[in-house]
Amino acid sequence: MADARSLHRPLGFGVAAIVLLLDQISKWAIMGPVALRERGLIEITGFFDLRWVENYGVSMGFLIAGSDRERWLLVAGTALIAAGIVAWIWREKAKGDVVALGLVLGGAIGNIADRTRLGYVADFLDPHIGDWHPFLVFNVADAAITIGVLILVLRALLVREPKVPAENVDAV
């Protein structure tokens, strides 16, 4: 009989693939047919716009890559993190954690693809309240990473896995 890990792995990697696909399709649309790069800003509503931002750093402008060397260091660092997440998905038994890790992995790969192909990460989602912008401009990959990390934190704080009785634990 398969264990929980082998049953949940396809789910985690499937979530990652869906996030990557949605991220790259949205960026293709924004840079292609929508032509946001040329337009700069498209006002949608009083609380949401499309705004073109070339992000040369990571979250909140941290670790700005000012040179090609720094850019490739960011790519390598993100790839190492993604490899760690793959290993975590491979070992993880909890379905909720596997889904959250899939969100993070798909987002990380989406941003790696941008940084490799474009030299920056394309951000364009701009929620706001009037003139107040409580969030930085972000993309689908960033949203998936944030949601995945929040799920992991909430599950770590709130979810208690049932304990296995000692007689059911395999001897080493």
Swiss-Prot record:
Keywords assigned by UniProt, alphabetized: Aspartyl protease, Cell inner membrane, Cell membrane, Hydrolase, Membrane, Protease, Transmembrane, Transmembrane helix
TM ranges: 70-90, 94-114, 134-154
Active site: 123, 142
PANTHER family: LIPOPROTEIN SIGNAL PEPTIDASE (PTHR33695:SF1)
A single GO molecular function term of this UniProt record: aspartic-type endopeptidase activity
Cross-referenced NCBIfam families: lspA
Protein's name according to its UniProt entry: Lipoprotein signal peptidase
Gene Ontology biological-process annotations: proteolysis
Main EC class the enzyme belongs to: hydrolase
E.C. code: 3.4.23.36
Domain of life the protein comes from: Bacteria
Function description: This protein specifically catalyzes the removal of signal peptides from prolipoproteins.
Coiled-coil blocks: none
Pathway as given in its UniProt record: Protein modification; lipoprotein biosynthesis (signal peptide cleavage)
Main location group: membrane
Localization terms from the record: Cell inner membrane
Family as reported in the entry's similarity comment: Belongs to the peptidase A8 family.
Cell inner membrane recorded as keyword: yes
This protein's encoding gene: lspA
This protein's GO CC annotations: plasma membrane
Catalyzed reactions per annotation: Release of signal peptides from bacterial membrane prolipoproteins. Hydrolyzes -Xaa-Yaa-Zaa-|-(S,diacylglyceryl)Cys-, in which Xaa is hydrophobic (preferably Leu), and Yaa (Ala or Ser) and Zaa (Gly or Ala) have small, neutral side chains
Keyword Nucleus: no
Membrane topology designation: Multi-pass membrane protein
